[in-house]
Amino acid sequence: MKGTREAEVFGINRYRNRRVDGHVHTELCPHGSGDKTALMVEKAIELHLEKICFTEHAPLPVEFSKVYLGDKKALDTAALTLDQVETYLALGNDLQKEYGEAIDISLGFEVDYLPGFESYTRSFLDQYGPVTGDNILSLHFMEGMAGGYWCLDYSPQEFENAFGPWIDQQDLLYGRYFETLLKGVRTDFGPYRPKRIGHLDSIKKFNRYFHWKPELDDKSKGLVLEILRTLKSQGRELDYNLSGLSKEYCGEVYPSRYIQGMAYVLGLPYVVGSDAHSILDLQKTWGPGAAILDAQAEAHEEGDA
C-alpha cells in the first residue's frame, strides 16, 4: 500500500476488481462546475473506468420551501428543477448512444429523504424509476433548533445557524441525524426505491471546524448498526463516497473506517463513488497517484486473510 488516505476504503465491493464510479453529477447540477458531461465521460474513459453512474440531484418538492428556513441560495442550488428532468434524461440517453461502446453509462438520481414528503418522493420514483438505475437516497436536510429544515452541508456558518447550541452537543446532533436517516431507510418508497444510501455519515463534514471527536457515542453506534442491518435485510448497498477526503473540515471517506468495518462484518456491499461535480474531481479520484484500486486490493486482502 502506498500510504494514501484512500486506504480507508474497506469492505465488500460489489464491483470487485473493476473500475466503477457509482456517484457522479452532470453539467446540469446547479452547484456543480458546469463542466460538459461529455467531457467528463471522455475523462472517465481516459482513466479506464468501466462504468460511470450519473446520479443527479432529483427535484425537491415545491412545498418544501415552506418548511425550509435556511439560506435561499442553498435551496435554489440544491437540485434540478422539475422542468429539467426530461433534459437530464435526454442528456444521459445521448451520452449512452455516443459512448456506450467505450463505457457503461448508468442514469439515475440522488434522491433526498425529506420527512413529511415521502409521498412526493415515492411518486417521483414511481414515474422515473422504470427509466433509471443506480438511484441513491441521501440526507442533505435536517430539522433545526427552531423547527423547519436546513441544509446540512452548505457551510459551517449555515450549520451554526441551523443547530445553534446543539453544536456543543455533538452526540445529540449525531443522534438526531442517524435517527432521521434510519427513518429514511425504513420508508417504503415502492418497487423503485434507491438501491444505495449516499455518504452515510456526512453529518461529519465540518468535524474539524467544530473540533468534534471522530468517534461515535454508543447511541449513534447503535443507530448506525440498525441502519446497516436494515440495508442488509433489504438487499441494498452503501455509497463509499470519496468526496469527504477533499473537504477542508472532513478529510475522511463517507462512511468512516469504523462504519466500513461494521458493514464488512454484516456482509453489506458498497460501490465507490467520487461524487464528482467536475472533470478535476474524476481526475483526483481515479487518476495517477489516487491509488483507489490499490486501496480496494488491500481491503480484499484483509478480508480474505
Residues of each region from the PLM?
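Conserved, mostly hydrophobic/aromatic
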Residues: 23, 44, 135, 199, ...
